């Protein structure tokens, strides 16, 4: 048996829960699933690209709209706290120096019933390039929300089965870093992918 925490409630990253899973000899992958090509992974990659190319990221936002029950539930603003933390930390973790709180806004924004299971994300990054010149990126991402996470969940299940076969317990750091927004240890996405490939090598 293993546990997958695909929602933004922090379990796999918490020492208390990690110890309990280790004591029981069970693997856990979490927390908060990162879609195959969703707003978080796109935002992370662009934020990292700014840094890698020597552009200072000054301000950024990510606004998300959807029509499914996930977005409907988040109309109750008290449910947004952990989701905003999860999505914001996922992006901030890719920066050498975190942006001030007032310069980053990331989170679910509203429920639009006629979108049904579609999700729209608007992402903007404002930066300063060589010679103190402004450099801005703005994009809109449209996805079918539910299936965008399905393949990721399947790959996470595969990693957990490998963990069971190898008798590895507790938080599976490589799988959590690659497949989840809020793992116990954040990695660059290319590093996390390589770590998953190494972990999955059963030879």
Segments (PLM) and residue ranges:
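Rossmann-fold NAD(P)-binding glycine/threonine-rich loop
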Residues: 1, 6-27
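Flexible, active-site-adjacent loop/turn segments at secondary-structure boundaries
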Residues: 8, 170-173, 177-178
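N-terminal charge/polar-biased segments
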Residues: 175-203
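Active-site-lining helix/loop region of Rossmann-like oxidoreductase modules
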Residues: 19-169, 173
């Amino acid at each position: 048996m293993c546990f997958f925490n695909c929602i933004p409630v922090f379990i796999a990253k918490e020492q208390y829960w990690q110890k309990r899973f280790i004591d029981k000899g069970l693997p856990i992958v979490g927390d908060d699933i990162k879609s195959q090509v969703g707003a978080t992974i796109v935002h992370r990659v662009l934020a990292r690209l700014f840094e890698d190319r020597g552009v200072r990221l000054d301000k950024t936002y990510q606004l998300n709209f959807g029509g499914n029950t996930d977005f409907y539930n988040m109309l109750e603003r008290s449910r947004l706290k952990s989701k905003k933390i999860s999505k914001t930390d996922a992006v901030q973790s890719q920066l050498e120096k975190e942006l001030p709180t007032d310069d980053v806004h990331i989170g679910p924004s509203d429920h639009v019933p006629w979108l049904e299971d579609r999700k729209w994300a608007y992402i903007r990054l404002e930066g300063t390039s060589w010679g103190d010149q402004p450099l801005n990126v703005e994009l809109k991402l449209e996805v079918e929300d539910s299936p965008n996470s399905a393949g990721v969940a399947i790959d996470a299940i595969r990693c957990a089965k490998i963990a069971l076969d190898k008798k590895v317990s507790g938080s599976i750091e490589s799988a959590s870093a690659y497949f989840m927004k809020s793992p116990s240890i954040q990695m660059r996405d290319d590093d996390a992918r390589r770590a998953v490939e190494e972990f999955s090598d059963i030879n």
